[in-house]
Each structure stands twice: as structure tokens, then as C-alpha cells.
Amino acid sequence: MDIKDILARCDHTLLRTDCTAAEIRALCDDAIRFGCASVCIPPAHVAGAKRYVNGRMKICTVIGFPNGYNTTAAKVFETEDAVKNGADEIDMVINLGMVKDKCWDILLDEIVRIKAACGGKLLKVIIECCLLTDEEKIKLCEIVSASGAEYIKTSTGFGGGGATREDVALFKANVAPHVKIKAAGGIANLQDAEDFLKLGADRLGTSRIVKAAKAMEKGE
């Protein structure tokens, strides 16, 4: 698989707590240069990044991140604010406590409400696989498939574990055909990226593929 094809499916990501505006601009420059799908950045940086890229790159941001236990009303407000500020894509975190309590109807309602708040923008639902049983993951595949969201996503990258090949395969076997898959967290190199894409991932959340592309340019 050509590295350009992999880069085109990467959300070039910087979600570190103390990231600066200068770092976000550099992230955007790299994403534009290497033809990434989007930059995934904190909500507070969306408006500035939108002005900076000036239509040259899609802006993705996160909602209820990273713990997911904000109220639904708070997540809806966050989503509306992000869209107003120029976000093209929204990655939301579900309430994992409600998963453990099997509050399936509440979880579905939350995703539906956030999708409505997206105003037509793309929605990815982060379920934090490292904290779930396979049975819970399968149930969430069903819920996301019914919600109107476009993507199911493996991980925040902050939950103690990232994407695994097993989880991407499980998603592929259990989501509806219209739901795409984003693998995120722990994608360390080009081989990881290629493996996830071959297993059925449509998008990758990582910064390391751009780093790999830079290293290749230098002949490293």
C-alpha cells in the first residue's frame, strides 16, 4: 500500500493537553503538505485553525473528550459550538458508565441528538474499546449503526489502550454496511496503519504516519 494512500486516510492528530497555537498551525501545514484527510485538534483551537487553513484542510475536533461522562446537554452545546467555529468533523466520546449500566436507549438518544447538532457534519463515535467487553462492543456496533453517525471509532488514545487489530475486525463484522471505522491510538508505524486498513478501517487517528513520511523524505 502506497504511503500517499495511507496518509489520505489519516486524521493527523494533536490532542495533547498543553498544545499551543503554533503547534496546531504546524500540524495543519503538515496535513496539507502530505494530503491527510483532516487535522484532529482540541475544540479551543478550531476557530483559529479554520482561519489558518482557509479551506485547504478539513478540521476535526473532539466532544466529551476524553472521558465521555459530560451530560448530553453539555455535549450537544460543545458540538454546536464546534460546528459554529468551523469544525467539519466531530469525534464524540460515549458515556462508558452508561454502557456498564446497559442504558442502551439513553446512549442511542445521545448519539442521535449529537448527530442532529452536527448540522450535516460528519460524526464519529468513540467507544473506548480497551475498557469494554466484546459483548459491549458488539452492542455498541448495533447502536452506532442505528444512530445516524457515519463512523465508529476505537479509542481516545487517553484510556489506557489504543486500537487493536481484533477490535477493527470485530467492528467490521458487526456494524451496518453504511458505518465506517476509525482506528486510533497506538498506530505506531506504517505496518500498523496498513494492517488496520486491510482489516477494514476507513480512517486512522495518528500523527506517526506523517512522521514516517518525513523520515522517508530524509532517507531514514
Predicted feature residues:
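Active-site mouth loops of central-metabolism enzymes
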Residues: 5-21, 60-76, 97-103, 124-136, ...
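Glycine-rich phosphate-binding active-site loops on the catalytic face of alpha/beta enzymes
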Residues: 61, 65, 84-99, 146-162, ...
